């Protein structure tokens, strides 16, 4: 380090304190990066990597970005998971002898972005921390841009993971390193995990109901936030304590499978429930809507309160339309307040704040048209006339973005400022008059008086007009020679310049001071403004519910006390929207305490998965307090929704499709209650037919005898349909389809009863598989069916000889015949009830473990073999004999 220049020594010293960050080191008009930081930044930002001291043996890699456009570059680095430490010059280089003092003034991390362009206005930007003790987990999270701060605790890791995936933080702070298994699961949400082993002695004022775990996890989070931001964050609200059990529970897979906020295929908002329901007019309302989708209510009183408000908005559609107009003029009050506190607010932001609070009286007056209950619900809406007057009297309507270049305040706001501006204005008028006078005096019509920051004011004459011109005759002193012009000054011009520029500089400096004072005055309104933002966001969500309810003809749900679920002409809200409404086929669903399992059969592509999803989504919408896409809807209040839909490997955790399926099924079977909803789509596909069939049947029986959860179970195992003979709680339904002239027609209608055909070949035709494959499938299928029809003994395993299709084996001339052997168990499903000691019963849809007689004899023979006394040749001979017996 001693071999480095003083500037590089300063850089290395500062960098040593911020090893986990890319250091933006201010040098004049640029932020420079060196060494590995430069290599990373040049690659991610796609900027040129150069070298400092290129002529030396070991030049230093470097790159840089202009300070005035740094925000965009920082945003790119943050979006790629990096942290950026911003190191500024703390002294004016022009007035400093020796090395300029530099300090890191802020660390930008994925969870602490405050710049307007760095965050999605319709998404929260959360940073989260959690700690673990012997008996519990404590978790706290914050959106630094809005000031939201919440904390909770729970006992198990599963709830921790559910909370993290629900909150979806961009950054996580922990006190100590976490295990690899937990880290892999968390990585589904974020890979930015910071270990902060030492907490400062600063104690932050947080109200955590004297719970030490909640206190310490909140201290950990705030310590990191203040350490990185290094400035006032007074807008961060008093911490709100909540319980995870106060909301409907859905894990990461349930939310993904139901596509609540992100589509599986596009990985975007489009095509999701959030996309459908977002008729909000404010960024605050959009963020609140996502929170409500992620956390449906389970308290009936709270749900009904929201529904009552939606009902009011539907019945007052003129007032609702007027309200939407008012809300459209409201900007992001939450984040505007955050920037006021943070100190990066500009004058245009404050004009947005002014327009926003000017709509509050209009909104409050409009609510008088509704009933007293609704008016009381939003009584916290408070006109801020004093703040509105302050902003109205002070700032120009269209101020510049920069707060350090003047032009911010209205005439009359400050007398001293007015005097400076008047002097500057008079000076400029004098300059205009001087330019006219000099043109007349010299006879040069193109003469002009201009200004730049290097020379100040000057007279410019083009070279074409200089021929025969004697500057001294007019008292001109040459200042600069250009290729096509000469620049001059006069004593009079220089004297006036001092007056004009002095006034301008003083005006700009005073305006900045006044702006800082104004910002501090607005800080006093932080808590009141945040209350207004909360009320407006809720109003926005509820009017959005009313808007979509009326637009798409939704119905108000009612909630049953006896666990009844009755949906009449229900639709999938998203699918219905993306297709012609008249083409969508609505369906009913009716479950209660006695019949709580639907076993759903039907062809592939017929709509089984869509039907099951729509029941789950309708339940979520209802518990959000929204109307639902049905003719009528009676629902229980669900505590949890479990899903297993579709096939997906969990590559992050190293789990196969089948393992993921089993893990999701395990969660449902272990944790579902009689108040839960389970969606199982074709459980058992990822293993052998018998294994899958046995698993599916066992899971159905388990739900029937234990949790009694409302369950929709789709399957292609048609043997399961006889379960309705032994399980009174199970009802067979199917999604209908017709075959006409060899073509499969999907009716998409759910009807009572089971079907015994999945129409696999017809669906394969619709997928345009090669005709040779389709024909071959039919040959093989005919052979299987013929063998079954010829067999009467249920304990006989049939050998099926299938004719070879030589067209499919043309690559080998030597092969003339292939025999495919398929053993078909012709046992018919017996409605045999096996009594249990406790009086319960279980039914096998078919006997999974009954072996043919011949096979049992061979098994017994194998069991009696003394393998220790057999030579390899004897064993091979015996194996050959057994094989012949099976044939």
Swiss-Prot record:
<keyword id="KW-0067">ATP-binding</keyword>
<dbReference type="InterPro" id="IPR036678">
    <property type="entry name" value="MutS_con_dom_sf"/>
</dbReference>
<keyword id="KW-0234">DNA repair</keyword>
<dbReference type="Pfam" id="PF05190">
    <property type="entry name" value="MutS_IV"/>
</dbReference>
<comment type="similarity">
    <text>Belongs to the DNA mismatch repair MutS family.</text>
</comment>
<dbReference type="GO" id="GO:0140664">
    <property type="term" value="F:ATP-dependent DNA damage sensor activity"/>
</dbReference>
<dbReference type="Pfam" id="PF01624">
    <property type="entry name" value="MutS_I"/>
</dbReference>
<dbReference type="Pfam" id="PF00488">
    <property type="entry name" value="MutS_V"/>
</dbReference>
<dbReference type="GO" id="GO:0006298">
    <property type="term" value="P:mismatch repair"/>
</dbReference>
<dbReference type="GO" id="GO:0030983">
    <property type="term" value="F:mismatched DNA binding"/>
</dbReference>
<dbReference type="InterPro" id="IPR045076">
    <property type="entry name" value="MutS"/>
</dbReference>
<dbReference type="GO" id="GO:0005524">
    <property type="term" value="F:ATP binding"/>
</dbReference>
<keyword id="KW-0227">DNA damage</keyword>
<keyword id="KW-0547">Nucleotide-binding</keyword>
<dbReference type="InterPro" id="IPR036187">
    <property type="entry name" value="DNA_mismatch_repair_MutS_sf"/>
</dbReference>
<dbReference type="InterPro" id="IPR016151">
    <property type="entry name" value="DNA_mismatch_repair_MutS_N"/>
</dbReference>
<dbReference type="InterPro" id="IPR007695">
    <property type="entry name" value="DNA_mismatch_repair_MutS-lik_N"/>
</dbReference>
<dbReference type="InterPro" id="IPR027417">
    <property type="entry name" value="P-loop_NTPase"/>
</dbReference>
<dbReference type="GO" id="GO:0005829">
    <property type="term" value="C:cytosol"/>
</dbReference>
<dbReference type="GO" id="GO:0003684">
    <property type="term" value="F:damaged DNA binding"/>
</dbReference>
<dbReference type="InterPro" id="IPR007861">
    <property type="entry name" value="DNA_mismatch_repair_MutS_clamp"/>
</dbReference>
<comment type="function">
    <text>This protein is involved in the repair of mismatches in DNA. It is possible that it carries out the mismatch recognition step. This protein has a weak ATPase activity.</text>
</comment>
<dbReference type="InterPro" id="IPR005748">
    <property type="entry name" value="DNA_mismatch_repair_MutS"/>
</dbReference>
<dbReference type="InterPro" id="IPR007860">
    <property type="entry name" value="DNA_mmatch_repair_MutS_con_dom"/>
</dbReference>
<dbReference type="Pfam" id="PF05188">
    <property type="entry name" value="MutS_II"/>
</dbReference>
<dbReference type="InterPro" id="IPR017261">
    <property type="entry name" value="DNA_mismatch_repair_MutS/MSH"/>
</dbReference>
<dbReference type="InterPro" id="IPR000432">
    <property type="entry name" value="DNA_mismatch_repair_MutS_C"/>
</dbReference>
<dbReference type="Pfam" id="PF05192">
    <property type="entry name" value="MutS_III"/>
</dbReference>
<keyword id="KW-0238">DNA-binding</keyword>
<dbReference type="InterPro" id="IPR007696">
    <property type="entry name" value="DNA_mismatch_repair_MutS_core"/>
</dbReference>
<feature type="binding site">
    <location>
        <begin position="602"/>
        <end position="609"/>
    </location>
    <ligand>
        <name>ATP</name>
    </ligand>
</feature>
<protein>
    <recommendedName>
        <fullName>DNA mismatch repair protein MutS</fullName>
    </recommendedName>
</protein>
